A protein has these predicted regions:
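Membrane-interface elements of multi-pass transporters and channels
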Residues: 28-36, 45, 49, 86, ...
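Long, contiguous bundles of hydrophobic transmembrane helices that form the permeation core
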Residues: 133-210
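Alpha-helical transmembrane segments of multi-pass membrane proteins
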Residues: 49-64, 87-106, 110, 127-133, ...
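Alpha-helical transmembrane segments and their lipid-water interface positions
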Residues: 17-21, 72-73, 108, 112-113, ...
Length: 210
């Protein structure tokens, strides 16, 4: 029993700061509209095509320092709005959003779960981050290209009405600006991505430095 409590105490001490840090980041994303900025960045990047990738990749990055269940809550309204805008079934959007945030939540520190496992096993955190990202990217890409044709043929599921009230479908889906989520006083994309990626980058660089 003493061994268990000893390991628990040391592990909790190691990851406690990251848990608090993740909660602060999540609150900041919610209050500033950073999630909207990130989604709009990906909409522009893909020129309005493969719209499901915008919230999916946002969740992928968001779940590196933030708990996956919180990332789901932050991404759900955005996913519903985009689905309504382009008349897409939620079966084409929700699975990939969940896939993206689940992969990094489970495989890439400093998310507390994988961070705790890494500490207990004495693994190099920088190496875990590197291989976690490699595995996550490959897994997401394979699943996306394999499952997209399947989900596109599934039963049409409407986005949740409470998220899409007042949202109209876009007639000209080739117009990128028409697909963007309009929200005032949102931070720039770079400022939105920075607090999510910086912890992992700093930990990885610190590990390489050792």
């Amino acid at each position: 029993f003493s061994s268990i409590t000893s390991y628990f105490g040391s592990t909790l001490g190691s990851i406690g700061v990251m848990i608090i840090f993740g909660a602060v980041i999540a609150a900041g994303i919610s209050d500033t509209g950073a999630a909207t900025s990130m989604v709009n960045f990906f909409i522009r990047l893909f020129k309005g095509k493969r719209l499901e990738l915008a919230p999916a990749l946002t969740g992928f990055i968001m779940s590196i320092p933030v708990f996956g269940d919180i990332a789901i809550i932050l991404n759900a309204p955005i996913s519903a709005i985009l689905a309504k805008r382009k008349k897409m079934s939620m079966t084409q959007v929700a699975p990939f959003v969940n896939l993206g945030l689940t992969l990094t939540h489970g495989l890439v520190p400093p998310t507390p779960g994988i961070l705790a496992v890494s500490v207990l096993l004495g693994a190099d955190i920088g190496t875990v981050i590197l291989w976690g990202l490699v595995c996550s990217v490959i897994s997401f890409a394979v699943c996306y290209f394999v499952l997209t044709p399947i989900y596109s043929k599934c039963e049409y599921i409407e986005p949740l009405a409470s998220y899409t009230e007042g949202i109209e479908a876009v007639e000209d889906t080739s117009s990128v600006d028409a697909l963007l989520i309009k929200e005032e006083n949102t931070p720039k994309a770079a400022a939105s991505f920075l607090p999510l990626l910086l912890p992992a980058v700093m930990i990885a660089v610190g590990s390489i430095g050792k």
